[in-house]
Amino acid sequence: MILHKSVFKSYIYVLTYFVFFSVMSCENSSVLQEAKHLTISEGFKNPLGFYDAKPTFSWELPVVEGVISQSAYQIVVASSPDLLPNNPDLWDSNKQSSSQSVWINYEGKPLVSRQKVFWQVKYWNQDDKASNWSPVQNFELGLLNNSDWKAKWIGLPTKEEGVLGSQDNIIHRPQYLRKVFELSNDVANARLYITAKGVFDVAINGEDVSDDVMPPGYTPYKKRIETITYDVTDLIESGQNTIGVEVAAGWHSGRLGWMKSYWSDTESPKILCQLEVTMKDGSKASIISDDTWKATTQGPIRISEIYDGETYDAHLEMPHWTTNSFDDKNWKAVQAFPVTSTIKLEPKRHTTVKSKIVLESKEIILKADAAIFDLQQNMVGVPLLKVPMKMGDTLKIRFAEMLSPDGTFYTDNYRSAQSTDYYIAAKEGTIEWMPKFTFHGFRYVELSGFDASKTPSKNWVKGVVQYSNFNENGSFTSSHEKLNQLQSNIVWGLRGNFFDIPTDCPQRDERMGWTGDAQVFGPTSMFNADVYKFWASWMQSVRESQYDNGGIPFVVPDVLHNGKVSSGWGDVCTIIPWKIYYRTGDVGILEENYDMMKKWVAHHQATSKDFISHMNSFADWLQPYPENGNNKGDTSHSLIGTAFFAHSAKLTAKTAEVLGKKEEQATYEALYKSVAKAFENAFFKNGKVKDVTATQTSYLLALAFDLLSEENKENAKQQLLEKISEADNHLRTGFLGTPLLSEVLDETGEIDLMYKLLFNETYPSWFYSINQGATTIWERWNSYSKAEGFNPMKMNSLNHYAYGAIGEWMYERITGIAPLQAGYKIISIAPIPKAPLTSASATLNTPYGEVASSWEIKNETLFLEVVVPPNTTAEIEIPTDNSESLKVDNENFTNGKNLKLIKNEKRKIKILAQPGTYEFQAKYSL
């Protein structure tokens, strides 16, 4: 094997090491190694300022000899680590006979704001042999209730001195706020609880408190604002101290959307902070934001706006303004406003945005009065600049995703977003600067206004890639360069559009949480990144944004405030929770969202007649070659709405089943069947579309959502194949149809055709954009071509993840890793090797540990390496031309303790595998 060999070698090495260690150790050879990767709720590791007083506990079993599965566990929870494991004062689960090692509910004493909690777990293996106790884990709750806040909202009235933006919108001047305070004793512990109506950066005694980017993030501000907790113990000392906070408009007080929408176009940005200090003598002090603070708008950040960029005037720098020595006599008194109950203050539910990757400039293009720096990767974030300048000159920094054929910046697709930063130099020499309260989508950076006597150097510009602070969750690679580039484009599209919320695009005057884009890409995102907490947090925003009539807005948070809905978009509220549940096994995501799902299905029903939908729809958005030239494509809106009505009813029924709500399950199953019957009667006859335009998507919806009677499904499949054949074996699908294409063709046995569609080089196809130089997924199948240039439409994002939904099929079918039971308790590993591939590999972190699948065809032999994590089982399908040729670890296959034959068919063998690492080989030719 050549692909991901290191993954399997390290797995074997770890296994060998622990076997050796367990043999050699004389400390306690009868006790198993402790559990690992302990987390709470949606994957948090020892969080500070946690949001939930009723967490769940999860862990993984170690990869060691003797640990196949879990037969029992015990969790102990205490208010002090000294009480563990023998004297837990908050909860002792006692020994529970269960294989469950994930999402176990806390059932102890009530927890309260600020409380620090410590916990451990031990498990018993399949032979009832006990493990060591795990290392002590902890979490600390944030301020859970508005009543916990004694601080006030503070700030200056900045609208009066604001400047007009590109759409005559008011841009609020960024504010600088500070407070000097005295502590009489040595500090034992200090917590800073802080948030903003806007975005903030905070420092204490001249030291940055964190490296968070634009906290607290983006939520439905009229319903909820998230708060952040920082441990600032090491930044505070006895005596005089100073806290300083910068605040800018961000999402809260800036314009959003192409229609100049706002959360508040009149309210000035504000901060809310509460510093709680415990002294070594046990006394306490609280420093709160109130009317004793002072502030100014005369700092160096003159303008900061998400769409238009940031302006920094170094002449106005205020050295040491967050230290005790700074003189603020010319600063103003702030205005103070009480915390009310109308807007909920809650600890942040997922990770903040961070600066994650730094890209180097790869090429410089010199112009008469400018230099263009090419990072050779479309990215999202800000530039890090080290540029020589003359005193008083202004450096202009522009951004673009691509260059026009004549070498000029292509910015038509930014629309009204100016996306331009400025730096005004206060002295001669090299300036070092990075914007703070804006972000851009770009590959190219153009500089003008630098010292013309200097020759531009690549080290002048670096790209700082910023996105929500999640880790990778899987990997995929293959023998095909363009398929690997597609995987890279999917990952970079995810990075670029997971900026606190799932955005449609990161560069133009939108960057909003479009629900349709989110629902089609959600499953793929979970293969590539650890984004459960990200999605769970955003789904709370979806719940908070749901209209009283049950409708779900186009975008969440709902800054458009137009009361409109769309089928296929609003259905995010049923699709995402179910997809998350099936990939994590966490019932909690269904419990949280079940009421919303029911309300949405009721809204579907209210906007239908005789079960046929009359709901508005963006439809199969950006379908290629539309007959009417419309962005909404050719598939009937009523057909789409009815299909999603049925699908959401079915998912709600399945959710009710998981939650044990039998009567409601029956109600929604009956509704699904009624809608499906009405769908078929209205739009199909003998499996063929009638009365509306027949499209690939119309058949895909009918088949994927199981809306046809059994006797008509086969004809519908043939009609779909005819539509694909009429398109010269190319797709004709937009946002809603594309994610269903691979699923339906797979289920109908048309694997060769799906491979053909995936590996097509010409428009419309995934490789078409790659052939034009794409490094991210595009909004349109034809956003650009080398022959014809840019699509003339300004709605032409070059970083738009929707068509990256194909990534789900790449993981689940090319390499074959899929759940057979919710949460991967039972795993399917069923790769489908096909030309032009000769190899493919993937890894995936499941709730139980890493699963891996790697195959290669060589000398008419399939080599398949598989990793099955502890506490799971896997059904492994091995394609072969000769079942008698199957070998495992270089030995002829026989039934044994760890591998049992399930089925032996003509072209494949199915085996039930226990946890472990296996190397299969069998005769197979492409």
Swiss-Prot record:
A Gene Ontology molecular function term of the record: alpha-L-rhamnosidase activity
Family: Belongs to the glycosyl hydrolase 78 family.
Membrane topology: Lipid-anchor
Function: Alpha-L-rhamnosidase involved in ulvan degradation. Ulvan is the main polysaccharide component of the Ulvales (green seaweed) cell wall. It is composed of disaccharide building blocks comprising 3-sulfated rhamnose (Rha3S) linked to D-glucuronic acid (GlcA), L-iduronic acid (IduA), or D-xylose (Xyl). Alpha-L-rhamnosidase converts Rha-Xyl-Rha3S, the product of a sulfatase acting on Rha3S-Xyl-Rha3S oligosaccharides, to Rha and Xyl-Rha3S. The enzyme is able to degrade p-nitrophenyl-alpha-L-rhamnopyranoside (PNP-Rha) in vitro.
Gene3D superfamilies: 1.50.10.10, Galactose-binding domain-like, Immunoglobulins, Maltose phosphorylase, domain 3
Entry-linked InterPro entries: 6-hairpin_glycosidase_sf (IPR008928), 6hp_glycosidase-like_sf (IPR012341), Alpha_rhamnosid (IPR016007), Bac_rhamnosid6H (IPR035396), Bac_rhamnosid_C (IPR035398), Bac_rhamnosid_N (IPR013737), Ig-like_fold (IPR013783), Rhamnosid_concanavalin (IPR008902)
One Pfam family in the UniProt entry: Bac_rhamnosid
Residues linked to a lipid group, N-palmitoyl cysteine type: C26
UniProt keyword annotations, A-Z: Cell membrane, Glycosidase, Hydrolase, Lipoprotein, Membrane, Palmitate, Signal
Lipidation (S-diacylglycerol cysteine): C26
UniProt-annotated catalytic positions: E510, E779
Organism, as annotated: Formosa agariphila (strain DSM 15362 / KCTC 12365 / LMG 23005 / KMM 3901 / M-2Alg 35-1)
The name this protein goes by in its record: Alpha-L-rhamnosidase
GO CC list: plasma membrane
Keyword Signal among record annotations: yes
Extent of the signal sequence: 1-25
Reactions mediated catalytically: Hydrolysis of terminal non-reducing alpha-L-rhamnose residues in alpha-L-rhamnosides
PANTHER family (alphabetical): ALPHA-RHAMNOSIDASE (EUROFUNG), ALPHA-RHAMNOSIDASE (EUROFUNG)-RELATED
Domain of life: Bacteria
Binding site for alpha-L-rhamnose: D504, R508, D509, E510, D517, W569, H800
Compartments in which it is found: Cell membrane
Coiled-coil ranges per UniProt: none
Induction and repression of expression: By ulvan and rhamnose.
EC number: 3.2.1.40
